[in-house]
C-alpha cells in the first residue's frame, strides 16, 4: 500500500514547474492535439439519434497569447448555465490530461448531458512557459486568461455563470469570484483552504520523511516571500516571485467575500490532500448558508475511482464517476 501511495504522489504531486524556464516539451508526451479555430463537432449521446450537444474548438486570444479552447454547449436555441473549468497546478492542457485520464473532457461531456455548457482552455504555461519566464505569478498562470475566458462565456447565450476549479484551480476560482461581477457559483474540487506550500510540504514529507525539516524550511520561505526578498530562489518547483504572487490570496476569505453559493468536494482517498484539509473546510464553513461541503471516500485527486490493490490501474482509462458529475450538475442547476 505504501508503494502505491508513493506512485500516486509522484504522479499527482503539486508541482508548479509551469512557471519554470526549464520546461519539458509536454506537447510531445500529451494526448493534446492542436486544433484550428472554430472547428465544431457533435458529441453522440447513447440512445440519442440526433444530439443537440456540440463542441466548438477554437483559439482564445488572451494577453497576446493564443490558447486552444473547447466550448461544449447545447445547440438548441435556449440559454443554459455555463461553467469555466480551471485546472490545477502545472502546465495542463484543456483536458487536464494525465496519462490516459482526461478529467476535464469527461466532466464537460457529463455536464453537457445534464444541459450545462462548459469552457475549458489550455493553461498559458502549457505552451508558453519559457516565454513567461521566472517571474511568472498567478496572474500569468491563471487570472489573466481566466478573466478572458469568463468574458467569452458572458458573450454566449447562457443563463448562469459558474467556476469549477480542481485542486489549485479551486483556490483560483475563489479568487476570481471575489473580484469578478456576475459569477453565480463556484465549485472547489479536491482543493484546500491551506497554503499551497504547506500542502506541498506534507506531500514531500510523506515521500521522504527523513528530510521533513528541510521541507518545513522551504514552506516557511515560500510563505514569507515578498517583493523585497524575491531573488529567483525555487521552492517546490516555483520561484519566490511566484510565491510573492500566490501569497496575496486568501481562499477562505475570498469565499466569504464572494458571498455566492459554493460547493466544496473533497475525498478521503485523495492522496494529494489530507484529512486536515477536510476538517479545515468543515471548521470554516459548516455553518455557512452559502457553502455546501461534500466528502467522498473513494475518488482520487483527479476524481477517478482506483483499485488500490492494483497500482497499474492508474495507467488504465476508467470512467469518471457519474455521482460526482451529478453533484456538480445538481449544484449548478439548484437541485
Tell me the role of every PLM-derived stretch.
Residues 43-78:
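N-terminal cap/lid segment of alpha/beta-hydrolase-fold proteins
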Residues 76-110:
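Short, surface-exposed "cap/lid" segments of acyl-processing enzymes
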Residues 103-128:
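Conserved alpha/beta-hydrolase
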Residues 135-155:
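Alpha/beta-hydrolase active-site loop
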Residues 187-255:
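Accessory cap/linker subdomain of secreted extracellular hydrolases
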Residues 258, 264-266:
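Short beta-strand/loop motif that positions the catalytic acidic residue
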Residues 271-277:
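Conserved alpha/beta-hydrolase "acid-adjacent" motif
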Residues 299-302, 307-335:
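Catalytic active-site module of serine/aspartate enzymes centered on a nucleophile-bearing elbow/loop
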Amino acid at each position: 500500500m505504501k508503494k502505491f501511495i508513493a506512485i500516486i504522489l509522484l504522479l499527482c504531486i503539486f508541482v508548479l514547474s509551469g512557471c519554470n524556464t526549464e520546461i519539458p516539451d509536454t506537447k510531445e508526451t500529451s494526448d493534446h492535439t492542436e486544433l484550428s479555430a472554430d472547428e465544431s463537432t457533435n458529441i453522440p449521446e447513447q440512445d440519442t439519434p440526433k444530439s443537440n450537444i456540440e463542441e466548438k474548438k477554437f483559439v482564445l486570444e488572451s494577453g497576446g497569447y493564443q490558447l486552444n479552447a473547447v466550448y461544449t454547449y447545447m445547440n438548441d436555441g435556449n440559454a443554459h448555465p455555463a461553467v469555466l473549468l480551471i485546472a490545477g497546478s502545472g502546465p495542463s492542457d484543456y483536458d487536464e490530461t494525465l496519462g490516459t485520464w482526461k478529467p476535464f473532457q469527461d466532466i464537460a461531456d457529463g455536464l453537457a448531458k445534464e444541459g450545462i455548457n462548459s469552457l475549458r482552455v489550455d493553461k498559458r504555461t502549457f505552451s508558453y512557459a519559457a516565454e513567461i519566464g521566472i517571474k511568472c505569478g498567478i496572474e500569468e498562470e491563471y487570472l489573466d486568461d481566466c478573466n478572458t475566458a469568463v468574458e467569452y462565456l458572458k458573450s454566449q447565450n447562457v443563463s448562469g455563470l459558474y467556476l469549477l476549479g480542481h485542486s489549485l484551480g479551486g483556490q483560483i476560482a475563489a479568487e476570481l469570484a471575489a473580484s469578478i461581477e456576475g459569477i453565480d457559483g463556484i465549485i472547489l474540487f479536491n482543493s484546500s483552504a491551506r497554503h499551497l506550500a504547506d500542502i506541498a510540504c506534507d506531500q514531500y514529507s510523506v515521500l521522504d520523511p527523513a528530510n521533513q525539516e528541510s521541507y518545513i524550511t522551504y514552506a516557511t520561505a515560500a510563505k514569507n516571500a515578498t517583493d523585497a526578498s524575491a531573488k529567483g530562489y525555487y521552492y517546490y518547483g516555483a520561484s519566490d516571485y511566484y510565491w510573492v504572487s500566490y501569497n496575496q490570496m486568501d481562499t477562505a476569505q475570498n469565499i466569504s467575500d464572494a458571498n455566492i453559493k459554493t460547493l466544496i468536494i473533497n475525498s478521503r482517498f485523495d492522496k494529494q490532500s489530507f484529512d486536515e484539509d477536510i476538517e479545515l473546510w468543515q471548521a470554516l464553513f459548516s455553518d455557512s448558508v452559502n457553502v455546501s461541503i461534500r466528502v467522498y471516500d473513494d475518488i482520487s485527486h483527479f476524481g477517478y475511482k482506483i483499485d488500490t490493490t492494483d497500482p497499474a490501474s492508474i495507467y488504465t482509462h476508467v470512467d469518471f464517476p457519474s455521482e460526482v458529475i451529478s453533484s456538480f450538475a445538481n449544484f449548478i442547476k439548484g437541485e
